[in-house]
């Protein structure tokens, strides 16, 4: 049976993650309060950030930056801003 959580990002009841995907206290907070749909949205934003800003996940500062962006996106309702990105038109 699927685990249900109240997703803080989407502000609704949603299917919970199957297991903790991120380490530490933040990982526990994500597991307890973020649904699969919101996590999928974050993964897309994360990929764009890594690619557009040429982040190196071996670099501590880049990992800290990405973690801050993740917290802002998932828990504080702040969208990720990616310079130069123009979303596709709705009619395409």
From Swiss-Prot:
Pfam families in the cross-refs: Iron_traffic
One Gene Ontology MF term: iron ion binding
Keyword Transferase set for record: no
Entry's Gene Ontology cellular component terms: cytosol
Entry keyword set: Iron
SUPFAM superfamilies: YggX-like
Domain of life: Bacteria
GO biological process: cellular response to oxidative stress
Similarity annotation: Belongs to the Fe(2+)-trafficking protein family.
Function in brief: Could be a mediator in iron transactions between iron acquisition and iron-requiring processes, such as synthesis and/or repair of Fe-S clusters in biosynthetic enzymes.
Protein's name in the database: Probable Fe(2+)-trafficking protein
Organism (species): Shewanella frigidimarina (strain NCIMB 400)
